[in-house]
Amino acid sequence: MKTPKLFKQCISVFMVILALSAGCSKKSMSVSGNGGGSNSFKVIGYLPNGTSLSAGANQVDFGKITHLYVAFINPDSLGNLTGTTDLKAVAALAHAKNVQIMASIGGGGAPKYYPSFLIGDKKSKLIKDLVNLAVDNNLDGIDVDLEGALIDANYENFVIDLAAALRQKNKQITAAIATVYKDQFTDKALAQFDFVNIMSYDRTGPWRPDKPGPHAPYSMAEEDLDYWLNTRKIPREKLTLGLPFYGYGFGGNAPESVSYKGILKQYPDSINQDEMHLNGGMVYYNGLPTIRKKTQLAKERVSGVMIWQLLQDTTGARSMLGEIDGVIRGK
């Protein structure tokens, strides 16, 4: 039976439309130009808030990250936020590169008086100031990196109230979490965050001189993901895996802490190993193969990677950020 010519033409047009629709519906994994959208793989880089935030930001390869976290902005003893110089300019720089920017509070060295700002009138003021900070400086939100004793009985109510206040202004809230503090995080607190970043490092360090060894082995990354995905049931799209751009030394005259960049300055060929002899001691870190393997693990199991911290990297072919980017792009 012959098909009329007009009908054939209609069928041909219909098939073309179907093909185009199918092509548009395919999900692709991208790292740049996505702003951290639902189909993107997040690459979150912490930028230390030192003497010149702008100078630090100018060293960042924005084409290889999706989120920039300024670490840290905290209240002084009177409750006034510090470290806000150049924040608006850096936010404009990030947004011009289609990168989201957050201010991170707390940190491993947060002030000892911090617990008093998680309750009462001080809490209300801090939340108001953080929301205003995000709005006034065109930030995308606030990252909560309260650690150790700061994850106390007041943590849950603090993040609930902060999340509510931020969302009224269409701002995000995220958190840095570590499995060592797993029992201190309530499910209700974790549910407030848009996503959380697992600090899968610092298993040991200078504070544990009797426990020398790797502080961020690949096995730790696997164990951390297993716990937060399977035991705590956090969806994969709300998790990222933290990667360290630094190492710790034990014994002899090895440095207590050293950046990846610092390691390469002394031993340029140490990129493919995770430990090295230095000054009569041992330094443990993640070399490029381990960073590549962890990034692949994150691609398979969660929605991104988090980096502490960007200025500890080197440039060129030995760059850790470049290695991460290569894995994401399938190179």
Set out the residue ranges of the language-model regions.
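Bacterial N-terminal signal peptides that target proteins for export
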Residues: 2-11
